[in-house]
Amino acid sequence: MSEPSVEWLDVAAARERLEAGALLAIDLRGPPDYAGGRIPGSVSLPGRAIESRWKKVPTGRTLLFVDDDGSRVEAVCALARAQGLVVAALRGGFEAWFDAGYPVETMSDGLPPLEDA
């Protein structure tokens, strides 16, 4: 039996699950985009660094991978599943979140990027 396809969440479902604490948003965009605006409480893990930093990814919740527009997350979800992580992807990415008018925090508001060990 093949690996299940990515669980795509629309922004309303993602927001509800984030607020309930069932998801942790992992922002795959680069540092300038992350600093400029992101989903509140999200953790920065730029796509190019993700494989070398799996051990720093918090576990215990489903990881919601977020990119600019949802076009790059499927491959990252496959890599994360191979590491035994439970994952989902935000349909439409950060653009859809922003366009829906949902809360956004900036670097001065929230969490710093995930640091290298």
Predicted stretch roles:
Residues 1-24, 30-62, 67-117:
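Rhodanese-like catalytic fold shared by cysteine-dependent sulfurtransferases
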